[in-house]
Amino acid sequence: MYRKFGMAAMLVSILLLMTGCFNVNEPINAQSEGIWDSYFVYPLSWLMIYFANAFNGSFGLAIIVVTLLIRLLILPLMIKQLKSTRAMQALQPEMQALREKYSAKDQRTQQKLQQETMALFQKHGVNPLAGCFPVLIQMPILLAFYHAIMRTREIGDEHFLWFVLNQPDPILLPIIAGITTFLQQKMMMVTDNPQMKVLLYVMPVMILVFAMFLPSSLALYWVIGNLFMILQTYFITGPNVGAKKVAADVKVGGKKK
């Protein structure tokens, strides 16, 4: 599970690095050139302007609608991720048995544990990395959305609810973003593994800190996206993907645990 935490940290670092590598002060419009601007940033900017005009100039509502459209676009991938999470939960009893069998910390035993674990995954057709693919796809979308927000001059200093869209909200919105991130991850938690519990608390804190310094419109994207994921998880798999009863209901190796 350390690998998943490392990947999450790496992706966030890449996001921040790439954010600094592009000129976020250059306005985005139909004349913008380059693959990044033409096919990633400008379409999102155009959508925000289109929906803002439809909502009497409200870019806050436009951001919410665009966020929901993005979530609907990647919904098939997220459903696949949820199914993969469910399958991983069903394998937890066998994985725990392997960890107990190969509990020694020497290199040879740990290699044997890894081999047996991979064989278990192959036996049941489970891809342990399947849950990472939606994250990889979301990162460029999030970066493009950040650029669209920063470079769409029409947004300006518009107020939405209690915050200004192109400025950070120092307290309330970041807290909401952190809480919804926690709830979303809690519902998708597969196991009581201590390392996963660390990730459960670290990611919301990271989102909270980022939301304190990034434009409120991006934090709004996180909040709406998290709420969508919470509802999606609830209606597709129930209130807790990691509930112990899941393992009892899913067939593993042709037998019910």
Curated annotation (Swiss-Prot):
Subcellular location(s) per record: Cell membrane
Residues annotated as signal peptide: 1-20
PROSITE patterns, alphabetized: PROKAR_LIPOPROTEIN (PS51257)
A Gene Ontology molecular function term of the record: membrane insertase activity
Membrane-topology descriptor: Multi-pass membrane protein
The entry's keywords: Cell membrane, Chaperone, Lipoprotein, Membrane, Palmitate, Protein transport, Signal, Transmembrane, Transmembrane helix, Transport
Summary of the function given for this chain in its UniProt record: Required for the insertion and/or proper folding and/or complex formation of integral membrane proteins into the membrane. Involved in integration of membrane proteins that insert both dependently and independently of the Sec translocase complex, as well as at least some lipoproteins.
Name of the protein described by the UniProt record: Membrane protein insertase YidC 1
Native organism: Halalkalibacterium halodurans (strain ATCC BAA-125 / DSM 18197 / FERM 7344 / JCM 9153 / C-125) (Bacillus halodurans)
